[in-house]
Amino acid sequence: MKLQQLRYIVEVVNHNLNVSSTAEGLYTSQPGISKQVRMLEDELGIQIFSRSGKHLTQVTPAGQEIIRIAREVLSKVDAIKSVAGEHTWPDKGSLYIATTHTQARYALPNVIKGFIERYPRVSLHMHQGSPTQIADAVSKGNADFAIATEALHLYEDLVMLPCYHWNRAIVVTPDHPLAGKKAITIEELAQYPLVTYTFGFTGRSELDTAFNRAGLTPRIVFTATDADVIKTYVRLGLGVGVIASMAVDPVADPDLVRVDAHDIFSHSTTKIGFRRSTFLRSYMYDFIQRFAPHLTRDVVDAAVALRSNEEIEVMFKDIKLPEK
C-alpha cells in the first residue's frame, strides 16, 4: 500500500468518480490512476468502487470507510510536513482560506495586507464560494481555514471559533421613502420589494427568521451572493437592499442612503474554522489573531482541546466579541 494510492482514491472521490478529471487535476495519466486503484483493491481483497464497464459508479460501503481513513492518513502526512516546515522555515509556507465574497471583500483586506507584509514568504490563496463549498474545501483538505457565518451545521467536523458579531443595514436611493428615516420597523420594511443575499449566504437566514417571527413574508425580488451586485440593483430602483453593514462604504457608495437595521435583525456571528487534525503553523496562529484579536494562541489551543463545538460555545459565552 502506497500513499500515492491513498491520494488517488481520495482525489477520485473529490472529482465525483471522474478518473479523467482526477488525472488532469493531478497532472498524471488516467490509465495510471486506474491501475493504482486496481492494485490497491487487489491488495486489500475488496472493491473500493463499484463499476459499470470502465466507469466508476459509486463508492462501496467498505470503500466509504477506506476513503474516510485515507483522508485521515493524508491529513496526518500533511501535518508531519507542517511540523518539519515549522522547524526548518517557520516563516515560509502556504495558507489556503475558504470564505464568502462579503468576508473576502470587506472583512479580510487589511488583515491579509498586514499578514503578507509580515510573511512575504507565505503564499496566501483564497477560495470564495457558498457555505457548502467552503465546508467541502476545508473538510477535503483543499483549504486550511473556513471563514463563515451561515450554515454552521456544515462545519460539525471542524473546530469553529467565534470571531466577531455583525448586523445588517438597509440601503436605498436618496429619493426612496425610507431614506429620511433613522430607523424603521420590520412592518415598514415588509411593504417594499427587497434585494438581498441568496439563501445560505451572509446572514440571509436571520432575515428570514426575523420576518417569520413577526408573522410576515418578505417580498424578495432579487438575490445575489455579492453585496456589490445587490447595491447595483438598488441603484437601479429594483428594491430596498438588505446587506451586511460592513458592506456599506460612505466613500464608495455616496449615492446610497444607509438606514440602521439593528432593531429589526439579531446580530450574526462570523467564525473561523479548521480541521482538528491540522497542525497550526506559527503564521497560522498569527493570521487567526490578526482576524480576531481575542483568539490568542493559548485561547485557540484551549478550544482545540475541547471535545465539541458545543463546549467551545460554552467557553466563549461570557467573552464580549468585537462588532463590525
From Swiss-Prot:
DNA-binding region: 19-38
GO MF assignments: DNA binding; DNA-binding transcription factor activity; identical protein binding; transcription cis-regulatory region binding
Stretches assigned to the HTH lysR-type domain: 1-59
Subcellular location: Cytoplasm
GO cellular component: cytosol
SUPFAM superfamilies (alphabetical): Periplasmic binding protein-like II, Winged helix' DNA-binding domain
Pfam families per the UniProt record, alphabetical: HTH_1 (PF00126), LysR_substrate (PF03466)
InterPro entries reported for this sequence: LysR_subst-bd, Tscrpt_reg_HTH_LysR, WH-like_DNA-bd_sf, WH_DNA-bd_sf
Keyword RNA-binding listed: no
Principal subcellular localization: cytoplasm
Superkingdom: Bacteria
Keywords noted in UniProt: Activator, Amino-acid biosynthesis, Cysteine biosynthesis, Cytoplasm, DNA-binding, Transcription, Transcription regulation
GO biological process, alphabetically ordered: cysteine biosynthetic process; DNA-templated transcription; regulation of DNA-templated transcription; response to X-ray
NCBIfam families assigned to the protein according to its UniProt record, in alphabetical order: PRK12681.1, PRK12684.1
Family from the record: Belongs to the LysR transcriptional regulatory family.
Assembly with partners or alone: Homotetramer.
Protein purpose: This protein is a positive regulator of gene expression for the cysteine regulon, a system of 10 or more loci involved in the biosynthesis of L-cysteine from inorganic sulfate. The inducer for CysB is N-acetylserine. CysB inhibits its own transcription.
PANTHER family linked to this entry: HTH-TYPE TRANSCRIPTIONAL REGULATOR, HTH-TYPE TRANSCRIPTIONAL REGULATOR CYSB-RELATED
Listed name of the protein: HTH-type transcriptional regulator CysB
Species for this entry: Escherichia coli (strain K12)
Lineage: Bacteria, Pseudomonadati, Pseudomonadota, Gammaproteobacteria, Enterobacterales
